[in-house]
Amino acid sequence: GEEGPVNLDLVADGPHALVAGCTGSGKSEALLGWLAAIAHCYSPEQVRFILIDYKGGATFARLEALPHTQALLTDLDAGATTRALEGIASILQRREESLGALGFPDLAAWESAHEEDPVSVSAPPPRLIVAIDEFRVLAQAHPDSMEVLLRLAAQGRSLGLHLIAATQRPSGAVSAQMRANMDI
């Protein structure tokens, strides 16, 4: 921009983001660039990606080889998407239990404590970015999964989960409750 580089920080500005635009507007390329920049700035020990691509896998295929990419799911295997969302819910439950056992209110506090004293404080788990290209198609194909995604979005800030949803038309696909947690 005219004032210099634009920075989007999911921790400071998020926790979640909505990328919207018509066909050919560059949504997928913007999302790819953003994820590549995150991978460039943070190690796989700091951030992991779960990529859900409802365009058959074409968008995120270039990111699959990154050590940050934990999973790439497509509309070609609908059962895998359901299992992945259930798995993410389990990960968040374990994080919540770990935070409680260690006495930290949220992942950011755990990260700060580890940074100050890496010998005494164990390393926190990586932040988890769930990026969904063609969110509307996912919502239509898996309407039951929207409840799980809503719960994940609500818990995301404190537990280190960040949802990035890309879609042509957010209305009808992204609920008001979910939008309330999407600050970017």
What does each of the following model-derived ranges do?
Residues G1-E111, S120-I184:
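P-loop NTPase catalytic phosphate-binding loop
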